[in-house]
Each structure stands twice: as structure tokens, then as C-alpha cells.
């Protein structure tokens, strides 16, 4: 009631009995396949990234979605944020000229302890965070020729596989593109 949520379900089974709703599936990647199997045929849903723990997981999830005629998307919302929409418009209108440099530098303190399941994952930073930046960059510059990435631990979160990444995207054009991400 505090947040004006009209209906709360006690289980996913109860929620999946609903008709004419959009399901927002936000579960750890290691259980996503099992949850997708339970989504009713013909439903509409948004899956929070990542789409499983591996390419094999993603392919199986895609297969289940197709077989059950589910309309689905994966949430990569950064490119739809107001600031990125405005930037995209400026780029499209040639207001900032030719893009020759694209660099993202981010240093934040993420409350990783709020998601203890992250400690079980082989990769954390790129599939759960930097993927938003990579998706946005691809929407602006297209697909890179190659990607070089190194993700490492951070001493403040020793139980996570990684929390920092250095990423270089190589393009055919005269574009230098790199990301330095520190959580």
C-alpha cells in the first residue's frame, strides 16, 4: 500500500495465472530458464539481463520463448534513458560532428551485498552492468570489429568474481572507443 502496488502475489505460480499482464522477470541468471518455462503461453514479458549464464542458456531461453509464442524483450534500458535519447538526437542531427572518440569512465560504489547470489557467478561486472554501456555504444557506432576486455576483482568485494573492467572496442573507422568501469 505504501507504494500503491495494487496486487502482490505470494508465488510465481500465482502470478502466472494472471491474464493480460506484462511480466517483468528479474531473477538470478542461473534460475532464468526454469522461470521462463513457467511463463504462460502467449504471454508478454521483459527479461532482466543477462539472458542466462551462457550463450547455451540464451539459446535455450530463446527456443522456449519461440515454442510458447511469448513476446519477450531483454531489458537494456540505458539507450532509452532521457539523457541518451537526447544525445542520440544530437548525433543524428550532426550537432556534435563526426564521432572519433567515445570513452566511458565510471567509478561508483555499488551495494553488491544486496544481491548475495552474485557471489556464485563466474562473471558479474560485464553481464550485469557494463552490458548497458556496450549496448548503447553499439546502437550509436554499430558492431565493433573486435572487443578486448579484462575484468578483475576489487578488494572491497573479494567474494565477487569481478567488479572492474577495462574494455576496448575496435572499429574499422577512425574511432577510439574504450570503457573503464570500477564498481
Question: Which residues make up each language-model segment?
Answer:
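Short, well-ordered coil/turn segments that N-cap beta-strands
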Residues: 21, 43, 70-71, 98, ...
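Hydrophobic residues in well-ordered beta-strands that form the structural core
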Residues: 47-48, 72-74, 179
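NAD(P)-dinucleotide binding in Rossmann-like oxidoreductases
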Residues: 157-162, 172-183
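Short beta-strand scaffold segments in enzyme catalytic cores
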Residues: 167-169
